[in-house]
């Protein structure tokens, strides 16, 4: 298994910005959210199963999934959320493993929004948390997704707390300030991860 740095953070924390900065340095990025979206693209078996289970009104005229409608449908129905997870999780896991096998960089950045909730930090060699104040998360997400404050507060309440994420962190990027600061933080961490990955490889050799 390649040396793995798991990247996590709450909604609106700036995970994608940080992941893009690592990708610019030539690091393979495996993003759980992107894989999950790919699983429900038109023509994918999972999308057909969702349409059958929830009804064709969840499919837009262009054949794509109406994500917001699905989120609203499962938000207050735990049994429907469980059904969706049972459908998607094995597919996501399979695709994730395949991407790990195809990775070519010295280490892999594995972006997992629900790293703490699903205890997936146990599968990584190191955990990097993008940290922001809850109020910043609210404002950024409201602007980005064009949703109400109440909607974002519901999502935040369902996610792991800031304290729970920081408790499993080996490294932290503070993203409360200007986005320009991220590049220097990522460059510093990248140098450190290259050393750790190199040590990991030498330890693994018989």
Curated annotation (Swiss-Prot):
Could you name the domain of life of the organism this protein comes from?
Bacteria
Gene Ontology cellular-component terms for this entry are: cytoplasm
Which segments constitute the DPCK domain? 4-200
Q: Do you know which Gene3D superfamilies this protein is assigned to?
A: P-loop containing nucleotide triphosphate hydrolases
Q: Which GO terms describe its biological process?
A: coenzyme A biosynthetic process
Write the record's keywords in alphabetical order, separated by commas: ATP-binding, Coenzyme A biosynthesis, Cytoplasm, Kinase, Nucleotide-binding, Transferase
Q: What is its main location?
A: cytoplasm
Pfam families assigned to the protein according to its UniProt record, in alphabetical order: CoaE
UniProt name for this protein: Dephospho-CoA kinase
Q: Which organism is it from?
A: Salmonella paratyphi A (strain ATCC 9150 / SARB42)
Q: Which gene underlies this protein?
A: coaE
């Amino acid at each position: 298994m390649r040396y793995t740095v798991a990247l996590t953070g709450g909604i609106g924390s700036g995970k994608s910005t940080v992941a893009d900065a690592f990708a610019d340095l030539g690091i393979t990025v495996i993003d759980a959210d992107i894989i999950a979206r790919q699983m429900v693209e038109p023509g994918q078996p999972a999308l057909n199963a969702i349409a059958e289970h929830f009804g064709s009104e969840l499919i837009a005229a262009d054949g794509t999934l109406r994500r917001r409608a699905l989120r609203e449908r499962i938000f207050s129905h735990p049994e429907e959320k469980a059904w969706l997870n049972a459908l998607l999780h094995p597919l996501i896991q399979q695709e994730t493993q395949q991407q790990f096998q195809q990775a070519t960089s010295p280490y892999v950045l594995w972006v997992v929004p629900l790293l703490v909730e699903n205890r997936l930090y146990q599968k990584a060699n190191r955990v990097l948390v993008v940290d922001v104040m809850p109020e910043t998360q609210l404002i950024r997400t409201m602007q980005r997704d064009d949703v109400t404050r109440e909607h974002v507060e519901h999502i935040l309440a369902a996610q792991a707390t800031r304290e729970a994420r920081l408790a499993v962190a080996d490294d932290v990027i503070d993203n409360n300030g200007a986005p320009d600061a991220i590049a220097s933080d990522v460059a510093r961490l990248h140098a450190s991860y290259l050393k750790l990955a190199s040590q990991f490889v030498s330890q693994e050799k018989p």
